[in-house]
Amino acid sequence: MPDDEPILEARELGRYVPATNKWLLQHVSLEVAAGERIVVVGPSGSGKTLLLRSLAWLDPLDAGTLYWRGRAVTRHVVPRFRSRVVYLHQRPALIAGTVAENLQYPFQFSVHRSRRFDAAQIEHWLRVLRREPDFLQKSSRDLSGGEAQITALLRAMQLTPDVLLLDEPTAALDPASAQGVEQCVSQWFQEAPQQRTIVWVSHDQEQAARMADRQLVMAAGRIVQGA
Amino acid sequence: MTYIDLTYTQVAAAALLILINGAISIALRLGMERTLAWASVRTVLQLWLVGLVLEWVFQVDRWYIVLALLTLMTLIAGITAGQRNRRRFPGIWFNTIVSLWAATWLTTAYVLLVVLQDTTSWYQPQYAIPLVGMVLGNSLNGTSIGLNSFTDTLVSHREQVEMALTLGASRWEAARTPVQHAVRTGMIPIINSMMVVGIVSLPGMMTGQLLSGTAPIAAVKYQIVIMFLIASATALCTVGVVLLSFLRLFNTEHQFLFRRISD
């Protein structure tokens, strides 16, 4: 693959609601290259979350095509695609059990069967985040919002995806927890800055400046700046 | 042994029992007298009508009439199973009707053709109609309970299901837990019945046979057959309806079509 070929390319994406005869996302075209850190900003309801969900192939599109490394995403590649382009919800969804069980959870899926849970890697990240190894034994029910988000991030990061799609991961967190999440994402990016890509939805202008080197502005379901 | 062929006077005497309910309603001011009277009238009329229909069907003894009656019964059961679901999605009726139809007809056919064998024809109304009726009534419960559980779990665990998809799970891997939970829940009533049958209560069919003079062991043998028939039909039906619903709510692109579910 030539270096300048985008990892993800959206062409004329559209999401339509027949009941209200309204396009929630329309004529959205976008190229995402390896090594980019993109932040998506815009008012509430402008389609930021829908854009991220569409880039993760989570919802059926009503228009347009999504390309992954130059090929259109089709049903045959979806689990593999999602193992390389990982979307994280604003509110982290964890399974019942310990943090360790949450981290091991993805390895039961056939797309990850050839891989193993790497405890050493997780412990390394925990040291960077100044967390004790016994964090792994905490029940997911006892985690604070920040800890839950970090668990969800670690669970995604250990899969070494090419792209992390982060949907306002710090919106519901206090400043200290938000800083932990930022640190976690930065750490993951810095480990291979030429290969890894972040698309981050944020309402926080300062955070956008800290975490991104390209800004997309959305309004009324379209990208109005930065595409 | 013989059975007592009831006269209309005897049936009327039994109707006096319903006066107890009326008296309770009046004494406690429950205001249920009208409902109770209407329910009693409906009981008599509905059973009377079904008796007349069955007499005619037994008399005529034609395969297409039996088949038409069984089809009608299956359709009504399928629609009822769908109606009992708190949530709706496109295709819910198709799912309940097809799964009830396939599961009850297949299992009943097995009992008629392989287990009973001695029936004069595969459609002999004396066997086919009550068996299908009993199986439908019980499978309907399993179907609606299983379907309810499936849609409820999908709605309450939407984030978990989507989280699995975002981490590379196939649609089946993402939905496996709600599917397993739904099938297990749908089968609880029949398993509970099997656990206590004969201890807590005597099943209706067995009671009927005993009243009509059948020897207890003969009635027990029939009841065992019926319990196994109902259990297998309920299992097949619950699995069928949950899997068909899974296919409606998760497309081949491994997307969870959450918006299809409405309250």
Labelled PLM ranges:
Chain A
Residues L164-E168:
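Catalytic Walker B motif of ABC-type/P-loop ATPase nucleotide-binding domains
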